[in-house]
A protein has these predicted regions:
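Intrinsically disordered, low-complexity polar/charged tails and linkers
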Residues: 63-87
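A hydrophobic, small-residue-rich beta->alpha segment in the mid-to-C-terminal subdomain
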Residues: 285, 294-329
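Short beta-strand elements
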Residues: 78-82, 218-223, 287-295
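Small-residue-enriched alpha-helical segments and adjacent helix-cap loops
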Residues: 65, 90-239, 263-264
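Single conserved hydrophobic/aromatic residue that forms the stacking wall/gate
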Residues: 330-341
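Rhodanese-like catalytic fold shared by cysteine-dependent sulfurtransferases
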Residues: 1-63
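Iron-sulfur cluster-binding cysteine motifs and their immediate structural context
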Residues: 239-260, 270-286
Protein backbone atom coordinates (compact mmCIF):
# COMPACT_ATOMS: atom_id res chain seq x y z
CA UNK A 1 0.00 0.00 0.00
CA UNK A 2 1.25 3.48 -0.88
CA UNK A 3 1.45 5.69 2.21
CA UNK A 4 0.34 8.65 0.12
CA UNK A 5 -3.00 6.92 -0.57
CA UNK A 6 -3.92 6.73 3.12
CA UNK A 7 -5.69 10.05 3.58
CA UNK A 8 -8.83 8.92 5.37
CA UNK A 9 -11.11 5.90 5.37
CA UNK A 10 -9.78 3.16 3.08
CA UNK A 11 -12.44 1.90 0.64
CA UNK A 12 -13.41 -1.70 1.35
CA UNK A 13 -11.70 -1.88 4.75
CA UNK A 14 -13.68 -1.21 7.90
CA UNK A 15 -12.08 0.63 10.80
CA UNK A 16 -12.86 -2.25 13.17
CA UNK A 17 -11.30 -4.97 11.01
CA UNK A 18 -8.15 -6.74 12.18
CA UNK A 19 -5.33 -5.99 9.75
CA UNK A 20 -1.86 -7.48 9.25
CA UNK A 21 0.62 -5.02 7.67
CA UNK A 22 3.36 -6.93 5.82
CA UNK A 23 6.52 -4.93 5.06
CA UNK A 24 9.96 -5.81 3.70
CA UNK A 25 11.34 -3.17 6.06
CA UNK A 26 9.57 -2.79 9.36
CA UNK A 27 9.94 0.98 9.51
CA UNK A 28 7.50 1.66 6.70
CA UNK A 29 5.07 -0.79 8.25
CA UNK A 30 5.10 1.16 11.49
CA UNK A 31 4.70 4.47 9.68
CA UNK A 32 1.66 3.03 7.88
CA UNK A 33 0.34 1.68 11.17
CA UNK A 34 0.60 5.13 12.79
CA UNK A 35 -1.02 6.79 9.79
CA UNK A 36 -3.91 4.31 9.81
CA UNK A 37 -4.30 4.72 13.56
CA UNK A 38 -4.73 8.46 13.01
CA UNK A 39 -7.68 7.67 10.72
CA UNK A 40 -9.30 5.24 13.15
CA UNK A 41 -7.75 1.86 12.22
CA UNK A 42 -6.60 0.62 15.61
CA UNK A 43 -6.57 -3.18 15.17
CA UNK A 44 -3.34 -3.47 13.18
CA UNK A 45 -0.20 -5.59 13.57
CA UNK A 46 3.08 -5.15 11.67
CA UNK A 47 4.97 -8.15 10.28
CA UNK A 48 8.59 -7.03 9.87
CA UNK A 49 11.16 -8.15 7.31
CA UNK A 50 8.79 -10.24 5.18
CA UNK A 51 7.99 -10.31 1.47
CA UNK A 52 4.93 -12.52 1.85
CA UNK A 53 2.45 -13.94 4.35
CA UNK A 54 0.25 -16.78 3.10
CA UNK A 55 -0.99 -15.41 -0.24
CA UNK A 56 -0.14 -11.76 0.49
CA UNK A 57 2.71 -10.51 -1.73
CA UNK A 58 4.63 -7.25 -1.36
CA UNK A 59 4.58 -5.50 -4.74
CA UNK A 60 7.97 -5.06 -6.41
CA UNK A 61 9.86 -6.50 -3.44
CA UNK A 62 13.58 -6.82 -4.22
CA UNK A 63 13.10 -5.59 -7.81
CA UNK A 64 16.53 -4.46 -8.97
CA UNK A 65 16.91 -1.09 -10.71
CA UNK A 66 18.91 -1.12 -13.98
CA UNK A 67 22.43 0.37 -13.62
CA UNK A 68 21.69 3.03 -16.25
CA UNK A 69 18.75 4.25 -14.18
CA UNK A 70 20.86 4.26 -11.00
CA UNK A 71 23.32 6.55 -12.79
CA UNK A 72 20.58 8.77 -14.19
CA UNK A 73 18.84 9.42 -10.87
CA UNK A 74 22.20 9.97 -9.16
CA UNK A 75 22.49 13.02 -11.39
CA UNK A 76 19.18 14.18 -9.93
CA UNK A 77 20.50 13.89 -6.38
CA UNK A 78 19.34 10.34 -5.52
CA UNK A 79 22.04 7.99 -4.26
CA UNK A 80 21.48 4.24 -4.24
CA UNK A 81 20.99 2.70 -0.77
CA UNK A 82 23.32 -0.32 -0.73
CA UNK A 83 21.11 -2.12 1.80
CA UNK A 84 18.34 -2.48 -0.78
CA UNK A 85 17.76 -3.18 -4.45
CA UNK A 86 15.36 -0.36 -5.23
CA UNK A 87 15.73 2.35 -2.58
CA UNK A 88 17.50 5.70 -2.87
CA UNK A 89 18.41 8.60 -0.59
CA UNK A 90 17.43 11.93 -2.14
CA UNK A 91 19.31 15.15 -1.38
CA UNK A 92 17.22 18.29 -0.96
CA UNK A 93 19.15 21.51 -1.59
CA UNK A 94 19.06 24.06 1.24
CA UNK A 95 21.16 26.87 -0.34
CA UNK A 96 23.49 27.09 2.69
CA UNK A 97 22.01 24.87 5.37
CA UNK A 98 19.27 27.34 6.28
CA UNK A 99 15.63 26.50 5.56
CA UNK A 100 12.29 27.96 6.60
CA UNK A 101 9.78 26.26 8.89
CA UNK A 102 7.48 25.83 5.88
CA UNK A 103 10.25 24.15 3.88
CA UNK A 104 11.05 21.92 6.85
CA UNK A 105 7.43 20.79 7.06
CA UNK A 106 7.39 20.06 3.33
CA UNK A 107 10.55 17.96 3.59
CA UNK A 108 9.18 16.03 6.57
CA UNK A 109 5.92 15.38 4.73
CA UNK A 110 7.81 14.29 1.62
CA UNK A 111 9.89 11.86 3.69
CA UNK A 112 6.75 10.34 5.16
CA UNK A 113 4.84 10.13 1.88
CA UNK A 114 7.60 9.04 -0.49
CA UNK A 115 10.48 7.74 1.65
CA UNK A 116 11.05 5.75 4.81
CA UNK A 117 10.18 8.71 7.02
CA UNK A 118 13.80 9.25 8.00
CA UNK A 119 15.81 12.41 7.29
CA UNK A 120 19.58 12.95 7.54
CA UNK A 121 21.92 15.90 7.04
CA UNK A 122 24.87 15.65 4.67
CA UNK A 123 28.29 17.24 5.15
CA UNK A 124 27.35 19.83 2.48
CA UNK A 125 24.28 20.80 4.56
CA UNK A 126 21.71 19.27 2.24
CA UNK A 127 18.77 17.37 3.72
CA UNK A 128 18.66 13.72 2.68
CA UNK A 129 15.31 11.93 2.48
CA UNK A 130 16.03 8.27 3.18
CA UNK A 131 14.59 5.12 1.65
CA UNK A 132 12.85 6.46 -1.46
CA UNK A 133 11.61 3.66 -3.75
CA UNK A 134 12.66 4.11 -7.37
CA UNK A 135 9.05 4.57 -8.49
CA UNK A 136 8.63 7.40 -5.96
CA UNK A 137 11.52 9.54 -7.21
CA UNK A 138 9.59 11.59 -9.75
CA UNK A 139 6.51 12.06 -7.52
CA UNK A 140 8.86 13.19 -4.74
CA UNK A 141 10.59 15.70 -7.01
CA UNK A 142 7.24 17.07 -8.16
CA UNK A 143 6.04 17.41 -4.57
CA UNK A 144 9.20 19.26 -3.56
CA UNK A 145 8.99 21.56 -6.60
CA UNK A 146 5.48 22.55 -5.59
CA UNK A 147 7.00 23.73 -2.30
CA UNK A 148 9.89 25.63 -3.90
CA UNK A 149 12.47 22.91 -3.23
CA UNK A 150 14.76 20.86 -5.46
CA UNK A 151 17.02 17.84 -5.31
CA UNK A 152 20.60 17.66 -6.58
CA UNK A 153 24.10 18.23 -5.26
CA UNK A 154 25.89 15.37 -7.02
CA UNK A 155 28.28 14.95 -9.92
CA UNK A 156 31.27 16.84 -11.33
CA UNK A 157 29.72 20.24 -10.87
CA UNK A 158 29.72 23.17 -8.48
CA UNK A 159 28.41 21.54 -5.31
CA UNK A 160 25.98 23.06 -2.77
CA UNK A 161 27.58 25.97 -0.93
CA UNK A 162 28.13 25.60 2.81
CA UNK A 163 28.22 28.45 5.29
CA UNK A 164 28.72 28.96 8.99
CA UNK A 165 26.33 31.10 11.05
CA UNK A 166 28.57 34.16 10.84
CA UNK A 167 25.57 36.39 10.15
CA UNK A 168 24.30 35.80 13.69
CA UNK A 169 27.41 34.53 15.53
CA UNK A 170 29.18 36.90 17.94
CA UNK A 171 32.45 36.24 16.12
CA UNK A 172 31.10 36.64 12.59
CA UNK A 173 32.76 39.43 10.59
CA UNK A 174 30.72 39.16 7.37
CA UNK A 175 27.14 38.34 6.40
CA UNK A 176 27.76 34.68 5.57
CA UNK A 177 24.11 33.92 4.81
CA UNK A 178 23.77 36.67 2.21
CA UNK A 179 27.12 35.93 0.54
CA UNK A 180 26.60 32.16 0.40
CA UNK A 181 23.09 32.58 -1.00
CA UNK A 182 24.41 34.87 -3.73
CA UNK A 183 27.16 32.37 -4.55
CA UNK A 184 24.53 29.63 -4.60
CA UNK A 185 22.39 31.48 -7.14
CA UNK A 186 25.25 32.66 -9.32
CA UNK A 187 27.38 29.54 -9.37
CA UNK A 188 25.43 26.49 -8.12
CA UNK A 189 22.43 27.44 -10.26
CA UNK A 190 24.27 29.53 -12.84
CA UNK A 191 26.78 26.75 -13.60
CA UNK A 192 24.37 23.88 -13.02
CA UNK A 193 24.70 22.50 -16.54
CA UNK A 194 28.49 22.96 -16.71
CA UNK A 195 30.44 19.72 -16.32
CA UNK A 196 33.73 20.27 -14.48
CA UNK A 197 36.80 18.00 -14.20
CA UNK A 198 35.72 17.11 -10.69
CA UNK A 199 33.27 18.33 -8.06
CA UNK A 200 33.97 21.91 -6.96
CA UNK A 201 33.22 22.74 -3.33
CA UNK A 202 32.81 26.24 -1.89
CA UNK A 203 32.55 27.23 1.78
CA UNK A 204 31.93 30.61 3.42
CA UNK A 205 33.23 31.21 6.95
CA UNK A 206 32.49 34.28 9.03
CA UNK A 207 35.83 34.47 10.86
CA UNK A 208 39.20 32.72 11.26
CA UNK A 209 37.68 30.20 13.69
CA UNK A 210 37.13 28.12 10.52
CA UNK A 211 34.02 26.32 11.77
CA UNK A 212 33.08 25.13 8.24
CA UNK A 213 36.73 24.57 7.23
CA UNK A 214 36.83 26.95 4.23
CA UNK A 215 40.52 26.20 3.73
CA UNK A 216 39.71 22.52 3.08
CA UNK A 217 37.40 23.33 0.17
CA UNK A 218 38.30 23.94 -3.45
CA UNK A 219 37.53 27.57 -2.70
CA UNK A 220 36.98 29.03 0.74
CA UNK A 221 36.10 32.51 1.93
CA UNK A 222 36.85 33.74 5.45
CA UNK A 223 35.73 37.04 6.98
CA UNK A 224 38.53 39.37 8.05
CA UNK A 225 38.88 42.40 10.34
CA UNK A 226 42.28 44.06 10.01
CA UNK A 227 43.11 46.22 13.05
CA UNK A 228 44.80 49.59 12.61
CA UNK A 229 46.84 50.92 15.55
CA UNK A 230 46.88 54.64 16.37
CA UNK A 231 50.30 54.91 18.02
CA UNK A 232 49.63 58.46 19.22
CA UNK A 233 46.83 57.17 21.45
CA UNK A 234 48.77 54.15 22.72
CA UNK A 235 50.12 54.71 26.26
CA UNK A 236 52.12 51.49 26.48
CA UNK A 237 50.16 50.19 29.47
CA UNK A 238 51.89 47.52 31.54
CA UNK A 239 48.69 45.50 31.32
CA UNK A 240 47.72 46.01 27.69
CA UNK A 241 44.13 44.99 26.95
CA UNK A 242 44.90 44.59 23.25
CA UNK A 243 47.77 42.22 24.03
CA UNK A 244 45.67 40.29 26.55
CA UNK A 245 42.76 39.96 24.13
CA UNK A 246 44.74 38.58 21.18
CA UNK A 247 43.94 34.82 21.04
CA UNK A 248 47.06 33.93 19.03
CA UNK A 249 49.43 36.29 20.91
CA UNK A 250 50.67 38.37 17.97
CA UNK A 251 49.92 41.71 19.66
CA UNK A 252 52.83 42.76 21.89
CA UNK A 253 53.90 45.92 23.71
CA UNK A 254 57.41 46.79 22.56
CA UNK A 255 59.33 49.95 23.42
CA UNK A 256 56.26 51.44 25.04
CA UNK A 257 53.87 50.89 22.11
CA UNK A 258 51.58 48.04 21.08
CA UNK A 259 52.64 46.31 17.87
CA UNK A 260 50.57 43.81 15.87
CA UNK A 261 52.60 41.57 13.58
CA UNK A 262 50.50 41.62 10.41
CA UNK A 263 52.52 38.82 8.83
CA UNK A 264 51.06 36.30 11.31
CA UNK A 265 47.88 38.08 12.46
CA UNK A 266 44.83 36.08 11.35
CA UNK A 267 42.64 39.21 11.36
CA UNK A 268 40.03 37.89 13.76
CA UNK A 269 39.38 41.44 14.98
CA UNK A 270 39.07 40.49 18.65
CA UNK A 271 41.44 43.29 19.66
CA UNK A 272 39.44 46.05 17.98
CA UNK A 273 37.79 48.30 20.56
CA UNK A 274 39.53 46.73 23.55
CA UNK A 275 41.95 49.59 24.28
CA UNK A 276 40.42 51.99 26.86
CA UNK A 277 42.33 54.84 25.21
CA UNK A 278 40.97 53.94 21.75
CA UNK A 279 44.34 53.11 20.24
CA UNK A 280 42.82 50.23 18.24
CA UNK A 281 39.46 51.46 17.01
CA UNK A 282 39.99 51.76 13.27
CA UNK A 283 39.84 48.62 11.18
CA UNK A 284 39.27 47.34 7.66
CA UNK A 285 36.76 44.55 7.08
CA UNK A 286 37.27 42.17 4.19
CA UNK A 287 37.43 38.66 2.78
CA UNK A 288 40.33 36.24 2.61
CA UNK A 289 40.08 33.69 -0.22
CA UNK A 290 41.65 30.22 -0.04
CA UNK A 291 42.07 27.99 -3.07
CA UNK A 292 43.08 24.36 -3.52
CA UNK A 293 41.81 22.85 -0.29
CA UNK A 294 40.87 19.19 -0.18
CA UNK A 295 39.58 16.59 2.23
CA UNK A 296 38.90 12.90 1.81
CA UNK A 297 41.38 10.10 1.18
CA UNK A 298 43.95 12.85 0.75
CA UNK A 299 43.85 16.05 2.77
CA UNK A 300 45.47 19.34 1.79
CA UNK A 301 45.06 22.80 3.26
CA UNK A 302 44.32 25.45 0.67
CA UNK A 303 46.56 28.46 0.11
CA UNK A 304 45.24 31.96 0.61
CA UNK A 305 45.62 34.71 -1.93
CA UNK A 306 47.87 37.54 -0.77
CA UNK A 307 45.22 40.21 -1.15
CA UNK A 308 42.45 40.66 1.41
CA UNK A 309 39.48 41.69 -0.72
CA UNK A 310 37.31 44.51 0.56
CA UNK A 311 34.18 44.20 -1.59
CA UNK A 312 31.76 41.37 -2.27
CA UNK A 313 32.01 42.06 -6.00
CA UNK A 314 35.74 41.34 -5.93
CA UNK A 315 35.11 38.05 -4.17
CA UNK A 316 32.43 36.93 -6.63
CA UNK A 317 34.79 37.78 -9.48
CA UNK A 318 37.53 35.62 -7.92
CA UNK A 319 35.08 32.73 -7.45
CA UNK A 320 34.10 32.84 -11.11
CA UNK A 321 37.71 33.02 -12.29
CA UNK A 322 38.59 30.04 -10.09
CA UNK A 323 35.74 27.97 -11.55
CA UNK A 324 36.74 28.91 -15.10
CA UNK A 325 40.34 27.98 -14.35
CA UNK A 326 39.15 24.65 -12.97
CA UNK A 327 37.00 24.16 -16.08
CA UNK A 328 40.08 24.62 -18.28
CA UNK A 329 41.46 21.40 -16.77
CA UNK A 330 38.60 19.30 -18.17
CA UNK A 331 41.08 17.28 -20.27
CA UNK A 332 42.90 16.07 -17.12
CA UNK A 333 41.42 12.81 -15.80
CA UNK A 334 43.19 13.00 -12.42
CA UNK A 335 41.46 15.35 -9.92
CA UNK A 336 43.65 18.45 -9.63
CA UNK A 337 43.77 21.04 -6.86
CA UNK A 338 43.80 24.67 -7.94
CA UNK A 339 46.83 25.55 -5.85
CA UNK A 340 48.89 22.97 -7.75
CA UNK A 341 48.54 24.92 -11.00
CA UNK A 342 48.11 28.46 -9.65
Amino acid sequence: MDLASVNGEIPGIGRDEKLLLVCVRGKRGYFLQNRMKYYGYKNTVVLEGATSFNDVKVKNAQAAVPPAEVTRVKGLGFLFDKRTQDRFNGRVITRNGKITAEESRAIAQAAELYGSGEIAMTSRLTVEIQGVPFDNIEPLREFLAQNGLETGGTGSKVRPVVSCKGTTCQYGLIDTFALSEEIHEKFYHGYHDVKLPHKFKIAVGGCPNNCVKPDLNDLGIIGQRIPQVDLEKCRGCKVCQVENTCPIKVAKVRDGKVVIDDSICNHCGRCVGKCPFKAVEAHQDGYRVYIGGRWGKKVAQGKYLDKVFTTKEEVLNVVEKAILLFLSLIHISEPTRLDVIS
